Curated annotation (Swiss-Prot):
Gene that this polypeptide is encoded by: tef
Species this protein is from: Drosophila simulans
Cellular location(s): Nucleus; Chromosome
UniProt-recorded name of the protein: Protein teflon
Note: Drosophilid specific gene duplication generates rgr and tef. Teflon has a function unique to Drosophilids.
Top-rank taxon, per record: Eukaryota
UniProt zinc finger (C2H2-type) residues: 33-56, 608-630, 634-657
Lineage: Eukaryota, Metazoa, Ecdysozoa, Arthropoda, Hexapoda
Function: Specifically required in males for proper segregation of autosomal bivalents at meiosis I. Expression is required in the male germ line prior to spermatocyte stage S4. May have a role as a bridging molecule maintaining adhesion to hold autosome bivalents together via heterochromatic connections.
GO biological process, one term: male meiosis chromosome separation
InterPro entries named among the record's database cross-references: Znf_C2H2_type
Length: 658
């Protein structure tokens, strides 16, 4: 290279001048050209040369402008030309090889005719042949042009979709062979059909497998008979008739039987003895037929029997022709006792008015009940000969009352109806002692119920007690927050009537009026669902912040945004319940009516505002799910995001806050 430069510099035609240097940056892997005249850097050689021609031509003394091009520009021009030539050649080849062949034959024929015309004299026969050849050539050209037009029209009308459902078109000329493009289209169609058939078969196989799996997973029908693996024991099979309808459960009036009516058992036993020819039935397991004695039959037969006799039911009594549905009580022995004439004072129905009066009187002195239990705790534990009360869980309750030793009488009473259905209950008392005991027992019982706000005397689990305490603590906390606004009656109407003095009531009313006047200004909060387009959560949070600031300033309290959101949710839920579900307008107290007048501007539809974030919910289910998400263990202090597990929290710290 140095020799070549020396040769150029030695000649008079070429003059070399140093205009710049090559600069290399190793960090960026870049090469640049440094201009000595203006001290600029250029990354490309064509730019550097154009810069020299335009700005430094006076120093370098260019004799003529040199056209400086990059290698890429030169190559791109050559590639475009080559591409255009290839396209033109492709079009010419696709127009049809047959036409070129015919043209070549025509040209040969014409050349031959010309040569013949030049060399030899013209004959009439040759002239006629040449005219026929020319006519044939023109006809073939016309036919080829029409065929080309038809092919173009067919290509334009062909659908672009990949479906090959139509019938294949037959070629007009059987001798004409298929072109390359037609062969390609046929191969594509054939391969696509094969692939689609494979996919179709695969789908059908999957459907068949799913149907077989569903048939295998179906449960057994109830009519299907299972194989019996154990031997059948005929003694254990009950002889009940399943076609007969079930008998209704006897009412209380049918089961309350006097002891004098049991004399009818004598007649029943004699009837069983007379029936010796009756067909025998197999014995039932734990089922003994018993006779149902109504109260009317007991009153008819009570006067005729006065002798104490004891009858034992024999095994023949169980041989009955008709199958009956047995009750859980088994009668093994019947004792016929003397008729009892009880005074009217001992059997009295309990009125609801007396119970309500007793409830009111029992609440006057609650401390007396505790003193009675502390002074003599064994006072309420009487002997079993005087009184015995047994209760069992479930709808059937058996009450056995045994009187004193002077006139021993056994009373068995079956109660089938539940405590909710029975309106009038019968109370059986033997003498004055048991009467006084029952009154004391009921009074202490009612006092305990009133003190604990319970309905049934049941043993409660410690978990239930803790839940009740937590609910009470939550209601107390909400009441304290509502007192700051003057609306404790929303949680409980009895708070203002019982717990507050008249002076405190006046102050509460004044504070409630102030809060309603302030709350009425913020239309976008209490009428969120009717605003269209709906307001954004950021805008609502700003409004709630302004509401809390104004309430704290005017009412001289220290409430947070979460407290204000909780108050708004409680007011909206209370207002919705009054007008829709739980409370009737006719039975509302004066305090509730007063608060309704204050919040008469509120609509029935409302929205739930989350205490811990700016989210707003219309449905209650979504709101409760969202509250559960806040009750988690890990929370980011920077972006206030919540995480259920420690791993998610640590991953968030690594990615979001490195």
């Amino acid at each position: 290279m140095s020799k070549f430069l020396d040769m150029l510099s030695g000649s008079q035609c070429v003059s070399l001048e140093k205009c710049g240097d090559v600069v290399v940056s190793t960090n960026d892997c870049m090469i640049a050209l440094y201009c000595h005249f203006c001290r600029d850097l250029f990354t490309q050689l064509p730019e550097f040369l154009r810069h020299l021609q335009s700005n430094h031509s006076d120093v370098l003394h260019f004799t003529k402008e040199h056209n400086v091009y990059s290698v890429e520009e030169l190559l791109s021009g050559e590639q475009d030309k080559a591409h255009e030539d290839a396209q033109s050649a492709g079009h010419n080849s696709s127009s049809g090889d047959s036409r070129s062949l015919m043209n070549s034959e025509d040209s040969r024929a014409i050349d031959g005719s010309e040569e013949n015309s030049d060399n030899s004299p013209v004959k009439p026969e040759q002239i006629g042949k040449q005219n026929e050849i020319n006519l044939l050539a023109e006809v073939t050209n016309i036919l080829l042009q029409t065929n080309d037009k038809e092919e173009r029209i067919n290509d334009e009308l062909k659908p672009e979709s990949g479906e090959f459902k139509g019938a294949r078109k037959k070629a007009n000329n059987e001798s004409s062979s298929l072109k390359i493009c037609d062969l390609k289209s046929h191969t594509i169609a054939r391969t696509s059909r094969k692939r689609m058939s494979l996919v179709k078969n695969h789908i059908l196989r999957v459907f068949d497998r799913d149907l077989i799996a569903k048939l295998e997973m179906k449960p057994l029908e109830p009519d299907s008979k299972l194989p019996i693996t154990e031997p059948i024991q005929e003694d254990n099979i009950p002889g009940t008739c399943f076609q007969t309808p079930p008998k209704p459960i006897p009412s209380l009036s049918q089961l309350s039987v006097r002891k004098s009516s049991l004399t009818e058992a004598n007649h029943i036993c004699t009837k069983y003895d007379t029936k010796k020819t009756a067909p025998t039935m197999p014995k039932l397991l734990n089922n003994v037929p018993k006779s149902i004695l109504t109260s009317q039959q007991a009153q008819v037969n009570s006067d005729s029997s006065e002798i104490n006799e004891t009858y034992h039911i024999s095994e023949a009594a169980s041989q009955v022709t008709k199958t009956t549905k047995s009750f859980p009580v088994q009668i093994n022995q019947i004792e016929i006792l003397q008729p009892l004439k009880l005074p009217k004072t001992l059997i009295t129905p309990i009125n609801e008015e007396g119970v309500s009066d007793q409830m009111e009187n029992s609440t006057k002195n609650i401390n007396n009940a505790q003193s009675l239990l502390k002074e003599n705790p064994k006072k309420f534990l009487k002997k079993p000969s005087e009184l015995e009360i047994k209760t069992k869980g479930g709808p059937n309750k058996f009450l056995n009352v045994i009187k004193s030793k002077a006139d021993p009488i056994i009373v068995k009473r079956v109660q089938t109806t539940s405590a909710k259905d029975s309106t009038n209950k019968i109370q059986i008392r033997s003498n004055d002692k048991t009467k006084g005991f029952a009154s004391e027992f009921n009074s202490t019982k009612i006092r305990k119920l009133k003190m604990e706000n319970c309905v049934d005397l049941k043993t409660e689990d410690p978990c239930d007690n803790t839940n009740m305490r937590l609910n009470k603590m939550a209601t107390i906390g909400s009441c304290e927050i509502l007192k700051a606004v003057g609306l404790p009656a929303i949680t409980d109407n009895a708070i203002e009537a019982i717990m507050l003095l008249p002076d405190e009531l006046e102050t509460m009313r004044i504070r409630a009026d102030q809060f309603t006047k302030i709350y009425k200004k913020y239309y976008s909060i209490w009428n969120y669902r009717k605003i269209f387009p709906p307001a954004k959560p950021d805008f609502i949070s700003q409004k709630i912040f302004a509401l809390t600031r104004e309430v704290n300033k005017t009412m001289l309290c220290n409430l947070a945004n979460s407290d204000i959101k909780g108050i708004i949710n409680q007011i909206s839920v209370w207002h919705y319940n009054i007008y829709t579900q739980y409370i009737e307008l006719d039975n509302i107290s004066e305090i509730a009516r007063y608060t309704l007048k204050l919040f008469s501007f509120l609509p029935v539809s409302f929205a739930y505002f989350c205490k811990w974030c700016d989210d707003i919910f219309i449905l209650k289910k979504e709101y409760l799910k969202h509250l559960i998400s806040h009750q988690v263990r890990f929370q980011c202090t920077k972006c206030i995001k919540v995480f259920k597990y420690k791993g998610y929290y640590e991953k968030h710290l690594r990615n979001a806050h490195p």
